[in-house]
Amino acid sequence: YRELYTPKVPNRIEGYYFGPILGLVLSKDGAVREGMSKNDYSSDPGFLLGVQVGKDFGDVRAEVEYAYISFDASISNRGSLSASIHNFFTRLILEKELGDRFDLRAGIGMGVGIVGLEDSADYNGAGFAYDFILGAGYRLAENLSLQLDYRYYLTAANDGYDHMKGHIWLLSAGLDL
């Protein structure tokens, strides 16, 4: 009788997972350069869409991720700027269980950021990028979890633009395979 009415706590499954990522991007202001002149821009909020695949080892997760970041910006003397960044990352995340369903997470990711900035001219480049992550996860079911994370993101500078950096708030789902 007791088993029938006791709520079931989902088991944590170690192994492979994948899932979508959706985020709010708060990019820091930066600058684009043409020769010796530097044009500062003010960033508007943007979005992040992506997918992640990884392996859960218990207290450690290793994952690969593709993410697309987009935001608009204003250049004071020239109008608007559109930014799009394609990221290919690997990430290592440490997790600490808090009870049966909650996890605290911290990690670091690194990879390649392919940056495209467009106004009347195009500023393109690819380079090293990295991020730091802090967040929490909640297990909804045996094979489904949700994570809410904060990331600080940074790419390398290029001849045509400054570092792309900013704050990202993410919501991701993990479907255990």
Segments predicted by a language model, with ranges:
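Hydrophobic core residues within well-ordered beta-strands of beta-rich domains
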Residues: 16, 47-49, 86-88, 104, ...
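Predominantly the C-terminal beta-signal and adjacent terminal strand-loop region
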Residues: 31, 66-74, 132, 138-177
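Gram-negative (and chloroplast) outer-membrane scaffold detector with strong preference
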Residues: 52-120, 138-140, 169-177
